[in-house]
Amino acid sequence: MKTEFLSINDIFFLVKIGFKYVLALFNGFYLIKIVSYPNEHSIITNKMIYIGIGILLKIILIIIYWIYFMDIYILKKNCNKKFFGNIYCNSNKIIDNNISTTIIESDDFEYKKLIKKFFLKKMYYSLKKGHKIVKLYMLKIYNSDFNCYFCNTRDILYAIIWYISLYYWRRDEYNILWSFNKIPIYIYNILLILLSSSYIDLVMIIISYNKSKYHMMKSKLLIDVFFSSPSAFFFSRHFFVLENGIDIYFLMGFLRIIKVFLNVSYAKTEQSYILTNTEIKVIRIILGVLLLCNAFASTLYTIQGIHPYNIDNHDLYYILNNYLDYFYFSIISISTVGYGDIIPTNKLSRVICIFFIFWTFIWVPIQFNDLIISIFCKKETYGKLSMNNQKLILLIGDIQPEQLNTFFFESVAYGNKLKFHILTTYPINLYEEQIKIADNYCISIYIKNFDLNEKHNTNLLYSVNAQNAYYMFLFSNKFNNGHYNIDTKSFTRLLILAKFLHGEKKNAVIELRNKCVSNIVKSIGCEHFAIVNLKHSLIVKNLVCPGFITFLSNLFTAYNYNENPYYFNNSKYLHSFNFIAEFNKGSIAKIFSFAAHDNMIGLNFDKLFYKLYESLGILLIGIESSHINNNHFVYSNKKRLNFFFENVGRSMIKGNGIRDRTRKTGKIGGHKKFKFKLVYLCFLKRYIHSLSRDNCDNTQMITILNCKKNNSKMNKLNKKFYLKEIPNLLEMLNNHVHLTNKSNLSTPTWNNGIKESYKEKNIKSYHYIIDTNNINVAYKNNIPEKGKKDRGGIYIGNKHTNDTCARTNESHKNNRLRSRRSQNGKPYLGILKNCNNELFHTKKMNNYYESYRNNSNINEISIPNKRNGKPKCYLNLLGKNYFMKENDKCIVLANSKKVINYLSKAKSLFWLFEINSTKMDKVTYDLKSIIKTKQYFNKIPTSNLVKNIPIMPHMKNKSIISKHDSKIIPMDYYDLFNAYKSFRVFPQINYGITKNMLRVSYKENFNNDINNNRSIGDRSNSNSFSKLGMDKSTLSLTKFSNENSHMDSNSNDNYTVNYEHSDQAFFKGCVNWGGCNNGNTNIRENAQNEVYSINDVMNSVIKMEADKYTFEVNLNDTILVENDYNVLQKNNIKNFASIKKSNKNSNNNNKCEQIKQLNNNLTFKKNEKKTKSNKQNTNDTLERRKNGVAYSYLDACQKYFAHSAKNKKLLLLINYASNIIQLVKLINKTCKYNIIILTSEISSINIHHIYNVAFIKCKTMDDYSLLNAGLLQAEYILILPTEVNDINEINEIDMNNIILTRKITYLLKKKKKNYFINNIITELINPTNIIFLEENNMIKMTEKKSSYSDFFPYINSTQFYSSNIISETMLYNFMAHHKSFTKFPVSNSTLKCLIKDINIIYVCELRKYSDFSFKKIKTFRDLFFFLSKKCIIAIALYRKGDKYVPFYIYTKPCENCLIRFDDIVYVL
């Protein structure tokens, strides 16, 4: 039972504390008592003044150290309990504010809770708390390096004062005491100052005795205790009987010489940046022996030396001779020579001789042993461990020297004094160059050669102080990176590290070579980098966005570019100075993130964006947040039926011609209205580009409810439209548009973007689930207009989804609907055969239906979303009405100095948000015509342009239109504008069908439909399209024309095209909704009796050899249909017929005749196909077992690329790597290329039929081999390094690639007039080898040390300012940068967003045309402001230089940089 009285332990603790403080006061009392002895030279007052000066000097130095150097936990007395509670809640992510939280204090301040009703207990615990704080302060200060340097300096000064005082010592015989009466007063005053400062050190030792027990037993501390005031008073009063007590410090001054020797013997040498470890050991031995002999001589001189009173004229000469004799005697005695000319005169001298000789015998051999070991033994360690609180970075695994350079560079560039502990499997001599770099740049390192994976010994981690690591990095071996066991080793090291930390959260990053164990690593809670996938993503992104590698390396590398001196040694580089200087000026901007300040919380993102930019030149590009957005945007419209369609249509087609034309017909209800809606929805599908599967998220739905319809007329407009934004802010949406019946689904048809279902009759209600992500992408490459209203005065509520906002934390694999789709985006066959309600009525969909059934008057549909605690990256929130919240982090592009000087201080931004800045005058820009043209061009597919648009002269080798890619390359805006004006008529034609249109379709059970009196041409009466599919073996193609509205029924010239089964594994077909003009159609025949489309705007029928044709299908513009021939045969599907829209006066009999003729052709070709199928299947089976090997580029085109599109670009890959399949897969996923691999070895894996790849084998990479492989026809050339089996092969392989790069550069310049050096992508292993890529001469490293140019030269240090050079080592900037080297780190999701989700806008040659004017927009700043008004953030310019600086990146929009008309603007 607790009582109010103290226990025995408490009383003992109070006594111990009291004794410490009394002992400290006791020392001060005797210091005053010593100086208060009668002295004729000074008075007590003067002595007290000098003592006060010494104490004050020590206190000032402690305060300076406390302010600038000490980092310790301070418990403030006036701290608010609520403040600490909030901190604890935030750290543990506790949302409920009602939960009472307990303050968890540091281990240094753990004490029992105060019991308020017991007064003595309260007083005791308050005293104990205060004492622990004082003790912690004293211990921290005493053990610091700052105090050590001060004490050593004081000891040296003490020794100098003692040697000066020897001149004034007097005595006639050695058996009497020395007289110190002739010592001047200034020596006494200096001695008093030194004694008073040492008194403070002794007080710190006394108070922090328990924590400094390791320092108490040292010999240096024993000397300090002997020189304390009580011991000095005791020896001076009772042992030596001195008149002046302070004279004892002169008499025993030789002990200070011994302390100086001890300081040198055990001094720290880990931070020596001038000498090597061996040199330091040699110097320590020499200096130690000299100091030891000097201490021996000083002790003997004090014991048996004499200096008579009568020698006054030659005092200095006499004292020097006398002291030199004793120094000579000490050397003779220590070396055991013993000449006998000088001998000890008394017993005390003999005892001193024995003591020093033994001391020498022990100390000198130990030092020589360490020296021999360091010279001759194999080095397993280098450097010394960091025992203080310096920031420690631990690197574990197979770290290469170049990777270590990256970490060194980041540390030096940010000015951080970091200590690196390296636990590596490589020998230490491999890091000789890195050790020199560390010595030159004052980087403290410790290297140990040991593999953590061998013995699984966690004690090894204790030996390198892993428990004190600020950040930890684990590396994998890059050699033989195709094997699985490499990541297994790294994963095993991670498990050992996790076991060592005992669940404690540490900042750890692991490098992986593949994604085999990435999910397991993620479950452990460790951040990981799949370095190979990151490299492949950069390469593929650079194919679409030129200069992207250089741009991203500028943002993530702390490199301050300077004009390299070797550029101006030759006069030919002088004219490139402007380009180099502009690049250096624009490359200052780096990417940072900082916590939102209190003044920023609650501000709109747009307002904060303009405030930071206008005042500080800081570009805010996004936020990192873990909050749930509580802003719900709910819109309803009860009056207008086609609210959704009008908004989407107007965003895509100017004027909404379809809606106006439908109004003019006067038939809004009934079959006509529903047919319009249905056809219009399919029309929208054709022009809405879907996002990739990696960016899918089910977050936003538009739900249209209660759509009732009769057979003839539609009921009143009683629909409700809801636009719902669920809590996760602006997440990427699922690229599906679903149209599903509320009741049973029947005869579904899979579409690329839409799911349609019909009931036979009496369809009363429909349930539309339309994913707005499809609309989102339609805006993707456009410039939206903020706050624009449609013609009906309805605000377009989904404008907030216009810009690209990325989130990469959630995977599409959780989407059950998406998991049913194949990898290439096409549906599986089983989906077409077995499509039922379960496909869409998943668990999440059932929640929507239940909420609808339970509440008919529902206004909002809540979609549950699990909270994810990890920070998410949101880019470009302009126009989203996002308000800054607490704990948000702002992602900015800025100069590091601005971020540190302004954003890291609490009160520096007060004026920025409190004072209203003057608004700039609104300026009207003439660029609106360009923006509108760009909008409508992107919204209308490029494949619908009838005339071929010419391109710029330097882009002649590039195709303007890529049907499998939504990206648009630089183009001629003048012809684009003319095409746009002529294309304004497009919406007035029936749903996008122009004159010459290729129609392919079929009808199931056509005779049954005739018996039921249903016309296939009249969609208003047709509600049953059972299934759409294409025969893989044979396809009937018909050509329709609007020129002659007549069909010759007697004509036998109905041609079909055989699409053989052996040509391709499956058939890609195109079925378009819509119809032709009124009347019958005529089948046209060309001169060669071949049927194909001329200037076809929807499909391309491409002529190939042997009268074979294929479709080139735009996946975004067509309905992909595929089915098995056997399935169609079972369903009696043998007829292919055209689906044509006709008016009411059309004749159904003509349609029947057309279909009969087509069926006859189909039957004939079907029989012909059976005779050839067996032979073709046998040959096809044999060919598939072989890989695609060709002898030349032309041979590859004939054999393997014959069925691909003519406008497909060629990608030439040189050298074969083990992970090249992953790269090819990623390239084909993003941009479709015909790929030729030029290599000396052929892969055993057949990848031709999957990725359209052909191999060309060659022994040497000579000029003929390169030209034969299609070098001149290649759009991009990618040079990969060959397999590296040993680290010594790195430079050899890099040199081969560098020579090959220069050879390709020479060939392209010789053969091509318009040559882009940026189209060559070279991957190097060692980034420092890039200095040899200089075109005309090798670069010699400058003797003068420039700022980092020699240290880290791989980024843009040569004339290849923007050449596509990439290295795995360069990617370690993303691993190191913003993790442990800066106070403003960026999360890993931001990096992924920048690599995968960035888009570009091209601005080319606008000054040549009168339609566009840049009178108001002249600089990058003007263009930045104009685009920001359109919710677009411009972040960089990619521009052309001259012959020596071909291309470079400019990333500083705050400067008045004049824009040029051939610049490419990077935007978010």
From Swiss-Prot:
Query: What does the record say about the knockout?
Result: No significant effects on the uptake of the K(+) congener 86Rb(+) by parasites. No significant effects on survival of infected mice. No significant effects on oocyst development in the midgut of Anopheles stephensi mosquitoes.
Where's it found, cell-wise? Answer: Membrane
InterPro entries linked to this entry: K_chnl_BK_asu, K_chnl_dom, K_chnl_Slo-like
Per the record, what is one GO cellular component?
Answer: membrane
Q: Which residues form a coiled coil?
A: 1141-1185
List compositional bias (Basic residues) regions by residue number: 814-823
Q: Decide whether keyword Lipoprotein is in the record.
A: no
Top-level taxon of origin = Eukaryota
**Alphabetic keyword roster:** Coiled coil, Ion channel, Ion transport, Membrane, Potassium, Potassium channel, Potassium transport, Transmembrane, Transmembrane helix, Transport
What sections of the protein cross the membrane?
Answer: 48-68, 146-165, 185-209, 221-240, 246-264, 285-306, 351-368
Q: List the disulfide bonds.
A: none
| Any one GO molecular-function label of the UniProt entry | potassium channel activity
Where is the stretch described as Disordered? 804-823
* Membrane topology note: Multi-pass membrane protein
Q: Which SUPFAM superfamilies match?
A: Voltage-gated potassium channels
Keyword Iron (UniProt):
no
**Intramembrane:** 326-344
**Biological role:** May be involved in transmembrane potassium transport at the subcellular level not affecting bulk potassium transport across the plasma membrane.
Specify the protein name.
Potassium channel K2
Native source organism of the sequence: Plasmodium berghei (strain Anka)
